[in-house]
Amino acid sequence: MRWLASIPVFGLLLLPGVAHAQDGFQSPSGNIFCEADGDTIRCDLVNSSFAKPPRPRDCDTDWGHAYSVGPRGASSVLCAGDTVVNRGARVLRYGARWDSKGVTCFSEQTGMRCINMDGRGFEISRTRLNRF
């Protein structure tokens, strides 16, 4: 009887986690988490102290913690009952940038700035929201 060498497959099982990690990142402070979803980037704040924009009447879930921008057009404040917080996401060090499908995010000591091809986007931090 012959024995076949076993081939380790555990590395293959980890591939989806690796791909997911490449699609998202967090700020060095651990307060901002961002993730790509198609051609849109979404960033969530864990803690914030600024006044949130008025909640739309049709928003019956969490409001003012999540922001998004696509490759064209204005940024959005999201009505979202979920989160993209992933404590295992790679850290985008201060001074570094992240590019994906027409959106670029810059990690800065003052917060996270994400901008699209139209020059529209947002800047967020614990103390500030600026949509432009």
Where are these regions (language model features)?
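N-terminal signal peptide c-region/cleavage motif recognized by signal peptidases
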Residues: 16-18
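Short, exposed beta-strand-loop hairpins at the edges of beta-sheets
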Residues: 106-123
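A low-complexity, Ser/Thr/Gly/Pro-enriched, surface-exposed linker/loop concept
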Residues: 41-92, 124-132
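Bacterial N-terminal signal peptides that target proteins for export
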Residues: 1-11
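Acidic, glycine-rich flexible loop segments
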Residues: 84-111
